[in-house]
C-alpha cells in the first residue's frame, strides 16, 4: 500500500510547539489532520485549548482553513495509570537521580507516534508531524532526533509502506520558534498562540502574562517566557 505524501497528520496538543507545527504543516501540505491524546495529564486543559486553536486558525487564515481537515482524540488513560510522573500525578516537579526531570513520561512520544501512525495509515496519510526538539527541551530521550529517525524506520517497516516523521522544530530554540510562527502567519498567528495555546505543566490559565497563560514557575512556563523575551529582544 502506498500512502498519499501530500497529506499530513500533526500531533497536536494545543501547546505553542504543536501549534507552530500545525501552522508549518498547513503551509507545506495540501491536506492536514490533527491528533491529540488524553492520557491523564495534569494539564488536561490543553485538550480544550486545542479546539480553540483549530477554530481560531480556521477563522483567521482562509487558505489554511481549506487544508485543515479531521481532528482525532484518542483516550490513552492507561499511560497515566502505568506512569508515576509529575505530568500525570501531583508529584513535585524536580530533577531525578537519573538526570531526567520528574515530568518525563517514559515512552510517551513512542506511543503517541505509534498510535498516530495507525490513524495515519487508516486515513491514507504518509507524513507525521511532531513538535519534538532537542534544542530548548527538558532532556527527554524520546524527543531526540536519533530516536525519531529510528522510529521512522520502524514504522515504515511495520506498516510496510514509507512513512515520514517531520520535526520542523528539532533544531530551533524557543526564540526561533516564535520567529518561525511570525514568518508563517505574522502578528495574527503569534497573537493566536499567546491567547489560545497552553504550555504550563500545572494547567494554570488564571493569569495572562506577556508570553501567554501559565503559572510562571514550572519548567514549561520558564522555557516559553525566556523564548518569548529573547525573540522580542531580537525582533
From Swiss-Prot:
Residues holding Zn(2+): 200, 215, 218, 221
Chain positions recorded as ATP binding sites: 12-22
Signal peptide annotation: none
UniProt KW keywords: ATP-binding, Ligase, Metal-binding, Nucleotide-binding, Queuosine biosynthesis, Zinc
Source organism, top-level taxon: Bacteria
Required cofactor names: Zn(2+)
This protein's pathway: Purine metabolism; 7-cyano-7-deazaguanine biosynthesis
EC number: 6.3.4.20
Cofactor remark: Binds 1 zinc ion per subunit.
Family in the record: Belongs to the QueC family.
Name of the protein described by the UniProt record: 7-cyano-7-deazaguanine synthase
Originating species: Methylibium petroleiphilum (strain ATCC BAA-1232 / LMG 22953 / PM1)
Amino acid at each position: 500500500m502506498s500512502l498519499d505524501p501530500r497529506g499530513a497528520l500533526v500531533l497536536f496538543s494545543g501547546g505553542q510547539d504543536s501549534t507552530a507545527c500545525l501552522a508549518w504543516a498547513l503551509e507545506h501540505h495540501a491536506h492536514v489532520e490533527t491528533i491529540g491524546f488524553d492520557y491523564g495529564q495534569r494539564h488536561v486543559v490543553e485538550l480544550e485549548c486545542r479546539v480553540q486553536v483549530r477554530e481560531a486558525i480556521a477563522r483567521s487564515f482562509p487558505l489554511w482553513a481549506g487544508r485543515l481537515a479531521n481532528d482525532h482524540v484518542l483516550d490513552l488513560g492507561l499511560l497515566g495509570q502505568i506512569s508515576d510522573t509529575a505530568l500525570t500525578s501531583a508529584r513535585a516537579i524536580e530533577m531525578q537521580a537519573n538526570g531526567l526531570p520528574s515530568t518525563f513520561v517514559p515512552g510517551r512520544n513512542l506511543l503517541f507516534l505509534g498510535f498516530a501512525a495507525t490513524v495515519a495509515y487508516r486515513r491514507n496519510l504518509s507524513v507525521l508531524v511532531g513538535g519534538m526538539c532537542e534544542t530548548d527541551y527538558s532532556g527527554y530521550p524520546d524527543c531526540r532526533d536519533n530516536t525519531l529517525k529510528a522510529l521512522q524506520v520502524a514504522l515504515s517497516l511495520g506498516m510496510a509502506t514509507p512513512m515520514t516523521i517531520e520535526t520542523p522544530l528539532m533544531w530551533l530554540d524557543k526564540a526561533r520558534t516564535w520567529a518561525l510562527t511570525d514568518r508563517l502567519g505574522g502578528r495574527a498567528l503569534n497573537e493566536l498562540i499567546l491567547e489560545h495555546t497552553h504550555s504550563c505543566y500545572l494547567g494554570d490559565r488564571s493569569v495572562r502574562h506577556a508570553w501567554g497563560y501559565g503559572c510562571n514557575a514550572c519548567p514549561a512556563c520558564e522555557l516559553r517566557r525566556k523564548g518569548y523575551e529573547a525573540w522580542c529582544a531580537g525582533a
